[in-house]
Amino acid sequence: MAKTIKVTQIRSSIGRLPKHKATLVGLGLRRIGHTVEREDTPAIRGMINLVSYMVKVEE
């Protein structure tokens, strides 16, 4: 089984760059406090790095 990570949105996407909003949607995050579990892949890590100021990551 692949390793997973928990990603939680901690800041609003209002007023952010459209690319950053799209990245949150790609991660499956919809609102502040929403948590999703994603596979730990380089693609997901890249998405998290792009919006690192809006999300919290738990290994």
UniProtKB/Swiss-Prot annotation:
GO terms for molecular function: structural constituent of ribosome. NCBIfam families: rpmD_bact. GO terms for cellular component: cytosolic large ribosomal subunit. Part of the 50S ribosomal subunit. GO terms for biological process: translation. It comes from Photorhabdus laumondii subsp. laumondii (strain DSM 15139 / CIP 105565 / TT01) (Photorhabdus luminescens subsp. laumondii). It comes from the Bacteria. The gene is rpmD. InterPro entries: Ribo_uL30_ferredoxin-like_sf, Ribosomal_uL30_bac-type, Ribosomal_uL30_CS, Ribosomal_uL30_ferredoxin-like. This is Large ribosomal subunit protein uL30. Belongs to the universal ribosomal protein uL30 family.
